[in-house]
């Protein structure tokens, strides 16, 4: 892989992989380490063919599983999942948007594992149902059903936590 190709791949996928890693481990430093290991493997061993996004997400998941095996512990309490968003003109808009993202991200962490994974793969990694089904060893129809149930449960969680007023119209 050429350095220029690698730089473009890094720029394109870094943020999504970081969010996905944060959803898995809940630790920003560990998430950065997992993403770095993923890109190192991509640089050293990726061969053309197939979906690069799918391949990167699978490598990241495997890196996380390897980390769990080696450390024998799982952290499931993320304080902050999203980095600062690109700054709009109004600082108040920044704060509102970041707070809303944190609330939704925290709500996602409260979902059952299979719901959380399907949402993370769908929303943040933007994988197709078939790719998610391959990762999770199920059928695409099941992925659609799980995603629908996950969105409904997330809405319920947000409403239960008194965040519902501002989310009612979005769903």
Indicate residue ranges for each PLM-predicted region.
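A short, charge-rich alpha-helical start-of-domain segment used by transcription regulators
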Residues: 1-19, 23, 29-32, 47
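Helix-turn-helix DNA-binding module
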Residues: 109, 113-117, 125-142
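Acidic, proline/glycine-rich intrinsically disordered inter-domain spacer in sigma factors
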Residues: 82-109
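Short helix-capping/turn signature of helix-turn-helix
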Residues: 13-14, 23-24, 120-127
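Structural recognition of an alpha-helix C-terminal capping motif at a helix-to-coil junction
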Residues: 19, 33-40, 44, 50-62
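DNA-recognition helix of helix-turn-helix
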Residues: 136-161
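Short, basic, alpha-helical segments at the C-terminal edge of helix-turn-helix-like DNA-binding modules
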Residues: 159-171
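Arg/Lys-rich amphipathic alpha helix in sigma70-family domain 2
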Residues: 51, 61-78, 97
